[in-house]
Amino acid sequence: MINKHNSVLHNQFWQSYNHRGFMVTKLSDLMSYVSSWARSNSLWPMTFGLACCAVEMMHTAASKYDLDRYGIMFRASPRQADVMIVAGTLTNKMAPALRKVYDQMTEPRYVISMGSCANGGGYYHYSYSVVRGCDRIVPVDIYVPGCPPTAEALLYGILCLQQKINRTATST
């Protein structure tokens, strides 16, 4: 009987926990770990392209970087998306539309702010018609700097979001 329990604890699945330095003792902890792993490896972003940063976002989705291999599939509907990539200058007239789209997204939802204009207003920071950062309208999880940021920078931001989701396990 002791050998039977030892074989369960020495299973390859449980060895992966030992390498990380912890062992799951409750089923809810295991389910939380598995759901955050699955959620981080199947992101469905919705594009909210407002300016030149949107071109770099499309470049990231093209064949050279191929976001499909990371489990990232772009969606056109906010009800199917769990990540919104805000790329470009957010004007005061566009801010209510951004909030409306964000509210239509499924929980848990994440926002990536891409480019200097989305992060803090950018070149048009002092204009009367520009919101000085999309974080004044929606909560932002990852900021990608640059004017416009490169495709590699956006890819790095998406990978950082995946790591953040893995770190913050949410109960379902």
Swiss-Prot record:
NDH-1 is composed of 14 different subunits. Subunits NuoB, C, D, E, F, and G constitute the peripheral sector of the complex. This is NADH-quinone oxidoreductase subunit B. Binds 1 [4Fe-4S] cluster. It comes from Ehrlichia ruminantium (strain Gardel). Its main location: membrane. Pfam families: Oxidored_q6 (PF01058). Its cofactor is [4Fe-4S] cluster. One of its GO terms (cellular component) is plasma membrane. It is a peripheral membrane protein. NDH-1 shuttles electrons from NADH, via FMN and iron-sulfur (Fe-S) centers, to quinones in the respiratory chain. Couples the redox reaction to proton translocation (for every two electrons transferred, four hydrogen ions are translocated across the cytoplasmic membrane), and thus conserves the redox energy in a proton gradient.
